[in-house]
Amino acid sequence: IALQHVPEEGDLLGVLWLIDKYIVHSNEDDLMEVITNNNDWRSLVENEISQEQRPFSLIEQPKNDYLEIPSHTDKEHIEILERIKQSIADGQVYQVNFGRFWTSKLIESPKVIFYRLLKSNPAPFSTYISAEDLGFAIVSSSPESLLKCQNGFVHTSPIKGTCERGNSIADEKELREIMIEDVKERSEHRMLVDLMRNDLSAVCEVGSVNIERFDVETYSNVQHLVSHIKGKLLPEENGLTAFNSIFPGGSITGCPRTMVCAVIDEIEMQPRSFWTGSAGWIDVHSGDCSWNILIRTLQAT
């Protein structure tokens, strides 16, 4: 597709780091494992870990008086939504995920913001990346897994459908039932699941792509409709080719994907950069990998 609003020359489109040493921290048992072939680095890190660490403490969150500038005004946002609904009614598209951006000056470091999010809105695929040499940092509180590949099997867990938690267990249950029965929420979710199943089918054995589970998952502040889809990779495919088939995620684009990517480019009028991309890792030897979708994301430059 031909894009009207392309990244400027010099803009980062993605970053890949080849990692030969790293630290794995298990949240379940609070243990750390140092993985490297460099014994000097291992000794240095293990010695640092063994030292008594001062707990990281957060001060009261300061007030940000800087103006937040939206990419679209509320009026423009409503007008664009009406255009999208008309395009759906005309049969041009089935689903479009239109986003807005807010720009402002930070009064705290991205690292501190990430710690605040871990406390206020913990999410299973949260991400913090700091690359001072490249001039950017990413903070994401993402609940969504785009792709996991392990031992020849691939998994994706698309999210579409959201409601509040409510103020009580009874409220939460009622809101959940309303969301489950909502025709719009279920229709959007079905379309998304069909899209992701089709993407996986391109790299998986015939008949192996199935929905393992469809459920409501509860997070700190919201409830989501989530499907878990699994497939068995063809012998000639791997995690990288699966990623190429499934990226960008359907939940942040829409369907049909090629058409809606052109529509999104037209209505958002700027590149999305890292937001709605993915952060993750891939084993270059086995092809095993895990990638999230960078939603609920802050990009600092």
Positions of predicted regions on the chain:
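Extended alpha-helical targeting/anchoring segments
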Residues: 1-301
